[in-house]
UniProtKB/Swiss-Prot annotation:
<dbReference type="InterPro" id="IPR020588">
    <property type="entry name" value="RecA_ATP-bd"/>
</dbReference>
<dbReference type="GO" id="GO:0017116">
    <property type="term" value="F:single-stranded DNA helicase activity"/>
</dbReference>
<dbReference type="GO" id="GO:0007131">
    <property type="term" value="P:reciprocal meiotic recombination"/>
</dbReference>
<dbReference type="InterPro" id="IPR013632">
    <property type="entry name" value="DNA_recomb/repair_Rad51_C"/>
</dbReference>
<keyword id="KW-0238">DNA-binding</keyword>
<dbReference type="GO" id="GO:0000794">
    <property type="term" value="C:condensed nuclear chromosome"/>
</dbReference>
<feature type="binding site">
    <location>
        <position position="315"/>
    </location>
    <ligand>
        <name>ssDNA</name>
    </ligand>
</feature>
<feature type="binding site">
    <location>
        <position position="235"/>
    </location>
    <ligand>
        <name>dsDNA</name>
    </ligand>
</feature>
<dbReference type="GO" id="GO:0003690">
    <property type="term" value="F:double-stranded DNA binding"/>
</dbReference>
<protein>
    <recommendedName>
        <fullName>Meiotic recombination protein DMC1 homolog A</fullName>
    </recommendedName>
</protein>
<comment type="similarity">
    <text>Belongs to the RecA family. DMC1 subfamily.</text>
</comment>
<feature type="binding site">
    <location>
        <position position="247"/>
    </location>
    <ligand>
        <name>ssDNA</name>
    </ligand>
</feature>
<dbReference type="GO" id="GO:0003697">
    <property type="term" value="F:single-stranded DNA binding"/>
</dbReference>
<keyword id="KW-0539">Nucleus</keyword>
<dbReference type="InterPro" id="IPR027417">
    <property type="entry name" value="P-loop_NTPase"/>
</dbReference>
<feature type="binding site">
    <location>
        <position position="241"/>
    </location>
    <ligand>
        <name>dsDNA</name>
    </ligand>
</feature>
<dbReference type="GO" id="GO:0007130">
    <property type="term" value="P:synaptonemal complex assembly"/>
</dbReference>
Amino acid sequence: MAPSKQYSEGGQLQLMDAERIEEEEECFESIDKLISQGINSGDVKKLQDAGIYTCNGLMMHTKKSLTGIKGLSEAKVDKICEAAEKLLSQGFITGSDLLIKRKSVVRITTGSQALDKLLGGGIETLCITEAFGEFRSGKTQLAHTLCVSAQLPIHMHGGNGKVAYIDTEGTFRPERIVPIAERFGMDANAVLDNIIYARAYTYEHQYNLLLGLAAKMAEEPFRLLIVDSVIALFRVDFSGRGELAERQQKLAQMLSRLTKIAEEFNVAVYITNQVIADPGGGMFITDLKKPAGGHVLAHAATIRLMLRKGKGEQRVCKIFDAPNLPEGEAVFQVTSGGIMDAKD
């Protein structure tokens, strides 16, 4: 594994020491460890070619999907799964053990103390955080700020890792990263080097990018995956009620993949979503809009944030749904340096 980059408080890049690298690697079991359990190296290579690079990721696949990999028979798949189970603990654990496991969650600062407080410390790893709202509500601006803050050291409320950005609308601007990096006292070129970017043009392309991402995350310490926006290409590639069922099925597969990436590699997944008209919202509701994606997206996102425009450059974030956060709102501001606390 190549040495990874880390920032000091002054923004200078440092090489992570061996102990820190070892901690990163302990987040998951490499698929190569199956060889020590008697699995043929050729079969391990077939798994890697199919986008499976960790034992954790392997156990997130059904045996039906694994037997679909060329060269893997049902008997081989059974043997591979048995070997993976020996390396992992996939059964029941106590609530106390789960609480200890939850201590591995990293919370990445949004750049605004008020917004961080609302979110319980920032954007969480191990889950999907969805932000939805109209255009200019701050969704993409928050994404740009997170690209930088995710690379801050842990003690500075960052994620100390790299960022993967999948852009479906062509709104990512590398020049926007420069002033945000300068605000945090970081080297802009180094920050940009730690962001891998891909422009997706179809929903299939978007899904294939996620499959290829596993190889990179298995080799280097990533802490954040951004998809901006998760629904745009599905709304283009599937039209009309006749294709709605297929669209939702494909969307569910995409979201399942995002969930697995979050849990497999301990990364935060931040997705943006569009809004649509809600004709059944009621006569007393003035803003008849709801997030796109229906129940499929609603159930997949762990934390749902509703963003709306405020006064001037101010934006308002409301907790729309979260398992561990109370309802509430926070006001923040979009500046040249990214997301900050609102100024009166």
